[in-house]
Amino acid sequence: MABWDKVNSVWSAVEQNITAIGQNILLRLFEQYPESEDYFPKLKNKSLGELKDTADIKAQADTVLRALGNIVKKKGDHSQPVKALAATHITTHKIPPHYFTKITTIAVGVLSEMYPSEMNAQAQAAFSGAFKNICSDIEKEYKAANFQG
């Protein structure tokens, strides 16, 4: 089970630098999974160097991290924001659910690098548990929608 209080205590620091953290997460996602760029039309077909400081990646980074933050702040009682997030990613963006696991795993790594004192082993375990819980709930929504992407 996730330690939501631990996650939220670190998340308050994340919010102070949310766009830069989101940029690092997205850039790492594109570096590790280049095919993931296909799901971000404004960002695809650009090198990581070209993307680094564009307004488009900053806007997308802000959107992604704020959506994740809204779910994290629910401390596990997140069915409504998860349903809304899944619905848009199923119908509009058509992003396969395994990308949520990829991006949240990357997020734990990036946060650990950027906030080494806050992201000790206990915090990393708390984030991993919280993100696993969130991703599992998102996958349930995909299954319920019979996603075929």
UniProtKB/Swiss-Prot annotation:
Gene this chain is encoded by: mb
Q: Which GO terms describe its biological process?
A: removal of superoxide radicals
Q: Which residues carry this modification: N-acetylalanine?
A: A2
EC no.? 1.7.-.-, 1.11.1.-
Q: What is this protein called?
A: Myoglobin
Entry's Gene Ontology molecular function annotations? heme binding; metal ion binding; nitrite reductase activity; oxygen binding; oxygen carrier activity; peroxidase activity
The protein's role, per its UniProt record: Monomeric heme protein which primary function is to store oxygen and facilitate its diffusion within muscle tissues. Reversibly binds oxygen through a pentacoordinated heme iron and enables its timely and efficient release as needed during periods of heightened demand. Depending on the oxidative conditions of tissues and cells, and in addition to its ability to bind oxygen, it also has a nitrite reductase activity whereby it regulates the production of bioactive nitric oxide.
The UniProt annotation places heme b binding at H89
Q: What InterPro entries would the database entry show?
A: Globin, Globin-like_sf, Myoglobin
Family named by the database record: Belongs to the globin family.
Record keyword Acetylation present: yes
Globin domain location is: 2-143
